[in-house]
């Protein structure tokens, strides 16, 4: 009986966590006016939705969490919002919110364009274009899934 209760509690926690993350996509989308499909396309491209993903770049900076937030943002995130690197790695919703905030700022600076999407990952124009072309098929996949 105890084993069944533990299994039931574990299943309930997993369901509740999954529901909370699903709600997070909608909330962040509404907060920044960015489509869920676009946010998912970026999260898939950046990390395959892995919130424990960490990468070191050639310039020595690091990218963390599902949205691969670059370490160049860490000081500002902590100063303005109290968000630490550890919080990004521990909380998918916080990671998603910060990634959307970065993308939103790009759209404010560059307009709602593929260039703004490319700037999420790259500084130079040619790299922005390559990144945008990686996002496009993923975006179409998630748009199609929303239509079902």
Regions found by a protein language model. Name each.
Residues 11-14:
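Short, linear, compositionally biased motifs with a strong N-terminal bias
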Residues 16-19:
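N-terminal signal peptide c-region/cleavage motif recognized by signal peptidases
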Residues 1-9:
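Bacterial N-terminal signal peptides that target proteins for export
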């Amino acid at each position: 009986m105890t084993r069944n209760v533990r299994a039931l509690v574990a299943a309930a926690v997993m369901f509740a966590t999954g529901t909370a993350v699903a709600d997070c996509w909608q909330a962040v989308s509404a907060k920044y006016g960015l489509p869920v499909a676009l946010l998912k396309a970026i999260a898939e491209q950046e990390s395959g939705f892995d919130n424990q993903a960490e990468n070191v770049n050639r310039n020595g900076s690091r990218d963390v969490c599902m949205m691969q937030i670059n370490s160049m943002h860490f000081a500002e995130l902590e100063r303005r919002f109290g968000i630490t690197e550890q919080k990004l790695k521990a909380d998918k919703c916080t990671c998603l919110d910060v990634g959307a905030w970065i993308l939103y700022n790009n759209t404010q600076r560059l307009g709602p364009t593929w260039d703004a999407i490319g700037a999420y990952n790259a500084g130079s124009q040619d790299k922005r274009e390559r990144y945008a072309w990686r996002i496009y098929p993923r975006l179409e996949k998630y748009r199609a899934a929303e239509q079902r």
